């Protein structure tokens, strides 16, 4: 999976897909009451990027619904995964439950259209810190209460704050989540990051019977040397400001026979068995 990073303006969706991304990540900003308002990262952000692009969240969902719906004029077959980077660290943890309710309802109304949409992308909920786990509980409660619990099959969980992996496992255990879990490891493209935690996540992913990590991705990679390093370690995905660079690396002799771009037929919740 090649995730286009910080795709917050509607016009950026096609831009990143044209560069080769098959997944996009966008930032969801909340008001003080936990209501999702806009897709917006803000300052600071990655080096070489404009941090201020934005869109109304519901308008973003309406557009992406079209882009991921077969036979729609806007349909782009390659876009199979949406990563929602939830900026919960900007609001009180006490509002995390309200935020989860709101995002679930907006997805129901604007993306899935309560069963009337054929939009098919998988959705990854990126939670910044384990202290905000009530967002996940609220999201699942809302799908159940609204009568659309089946959409859980399309939704995965990912904690992005580089926290202790055992601590993350404990929270997932509290929530009763034993599947559909991704694990991110990374840092802004402005800085270098070692591989110790990334290797630990990959080791846990590959441990038989360990159900708290199904996929691992590294972020935010812009240098080809770091992309190569991550691929050699065996990551499932790369988040990048430059998907075209990832495409070029994947075509290199070392990787061409080992990796390919994920398609809709690849289940993002299953561990890869090479």
UniProtKB/Swiss-Prot annotation:
Active site: 5, 41 (nucleophile)
Gene Ontology biological-process annotations: killing of cells of another organism; lipid catabolic process
Top EC category: lyase
Enzyme Commission code(s) on record: 4.6.1.-
Gene Ontology terms, MF aspect: lyase activity; metal ion binding; phosphoric diester hydrolase activity; toxin activity
Any Gene Ontology CC annotation: extracellular region
Compartment(s): Secreted
Major location category of this protein: secreted
Binding sites annotated in the UniProt record for Mg(2+): 25, 27, 85
Cofactor(s) needed: Mg(2+)
Function: Dermonecrotic toxins cleave the phosphodiester linkage between the phosphate and headgroup of certain phospholipids (sphingolipid and lysolipid substrates), forming an alcohol (often choline) and a cyclic phosphate. This toxin acts on sphingomyelin (SM). It may also act on ceramide phosphoethanolamine (CPE), lysophosphatidylcholine (LPC) and lysophosphatidylethanolamine (LPE), but not on lysophosphatidylserine (LPS), and lysophosphatidylglycerol (LPG). It acts by transphosphatidylation, releasing exclusively cyclic phosphate products as second products.
Family stated for the protein in its record: Belongs to the arthropod phospholipase D family. Class II subfamily.
Protein's name according to its UniProt entry: Dermonecrotic toxin SdSicTox-betaIIB1biii
Species of the source: Sicarius cf. damarensis (strain GJB-2008) (Six-eyed sand spider)
């Amino acid at each position: 999976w090649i995730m286009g990073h910080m795709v917050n303006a509607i016009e950026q969706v096609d831009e990143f897909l044209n560069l080769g991304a098959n997944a996009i990540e966008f930032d969801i900003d909340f008001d003080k009451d936990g209501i999702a308002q806009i897709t917006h990262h803000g300052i600071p952000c990655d080096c070489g990027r404009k941090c201020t692009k934005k869109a109304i969240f519901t308008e973003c969902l309406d557009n992406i619904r079209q882009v991921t719906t077969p036979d729609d004029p806007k349909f782009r077959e390659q876009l199979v995964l949406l990563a929602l980077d939830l900026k919960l660290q900007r609001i009180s943890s006490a509002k995390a439950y309200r935020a989860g309710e709101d995002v679930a309802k907006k997805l129901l109304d604007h993306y899935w259209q309560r069963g009337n949409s054929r939009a098919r992308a998988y959705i990854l909920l990126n939670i910044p810190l384990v202290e905000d786990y009530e967002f996940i509980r609220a999201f699942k409660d809302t799908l159940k209460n609204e009568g659309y619990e089946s959409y859980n099959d399309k939704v995965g969980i990912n904690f992005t704050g580089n926290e202790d992996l055992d601590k993350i496992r404990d929270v997932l255990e509290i929530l009763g989540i034993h599947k559909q879990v991704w694990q991110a490891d990374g840092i802004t493209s402005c800085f270098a990051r070692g591989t110790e935690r990334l290797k630990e996540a990959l080791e846990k992913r590959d441990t038989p019977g360990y159900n708290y990590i199904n996929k691992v991705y590294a972020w935010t990679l812009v240098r080809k040397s770091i992309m190569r390093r991550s691929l050699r370690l065996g990551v499932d995905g790369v988040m990048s400001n430059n998907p075209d660079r990832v495409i070029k690396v994947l075509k290199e002799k070392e990787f061409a026979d080992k990796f390919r771009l994920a398609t809709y037929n690849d289940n993002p919740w299953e561990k890869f068995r090479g």
